[in-house]
Amino acid sequence: MSSAVMTTSATGGGHSLMESVDARTKLAGSNRMEILLFSLGTNETFGINVFKVREVSKTPTITRTPNMPAGVEGLISLRGNVIPVLELSQAMQLTDAPPGRGGSMMVTEYSKRTLGFLVHGVDRIIRVEWDKVRAPEAVTSGGHAYITAITELPNGKLVSIVDVEQILANTFGEGIVGQIEPMHAAEDFNVFFVDDSSVARKKIGEVLDKLGVKHKHAANGLEAWTRLSGMAGHAQQLGRSVKEEVNLILVDAEMPEMDGYVLTKNIKSDPRFDGIPVVMHSSLSSEANRAMGKSVGVDAYVAKFDADILAETLRPMLIKAGRD
């Protein structure tokens, strides 16, 4: 597995590292992503999607408070907002990480939550094709449960892309999906959803179960497109519409092998899926990411994770799709 990468130095620190993020929105639909590489003091190289990172700085003064979850170093004040700071190696339970506090902090925005992640050091930004990103079946890291994907640098070194959803769920708890009113004649509706995070798949499944609708899922964009194309081809052979098998498609934005933007473009450009709404459900909640979703034709964009908002977005769209 290899890929040509474009690199950007991260040694400038501060805002300069992230100042061109807005220009990167043109990556939407190109099946490419940009990864910020960093170290946790082990032999591994880790990465995080650039769109999740707001800034990088030296580790600031951190205020410790009682009863913090394991891995949470404390709180900082950042431009008037108090945010928690996690020591990422502890949150990922890396037993071979050196003791002591990481010297750099990545400020991230994830699922409408701003967090600081302490890391040993920040390297550079690379651009990589999503089809060169793989699920982490072969990862042997001590923190393998917190890795959502892997890719490879031109020198053969592997990059482990961290599963922020899993880290947050284990640190702060997954949250409870509350009461959701079931849909009338819910058994008539079918949802197909795709997300590479097991935490997200579990939560989405809970919401759909409470709505009472039937559902199927995939774990990455390529798997989703393969299965959806197969469903459409089978329906075509039987002289039926694929809408009899799926009434709505729910997609994550960033996924191994094919991202949600390319998946949406494929769906929207295939007449067999005419009339089937596509909802993008992503932890990348900025307006820029909403615009990226709109540019490829999504019918709605929902930021993770609010079970009520997700349910109330899907409900009228399913009813309308069922009538059409």
Name each region found by the language model:
Residues 1-247, 253-262, 269-277, 283-295, ...:
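An acidic, low-aromatic, low-complexity terminal/linker signal
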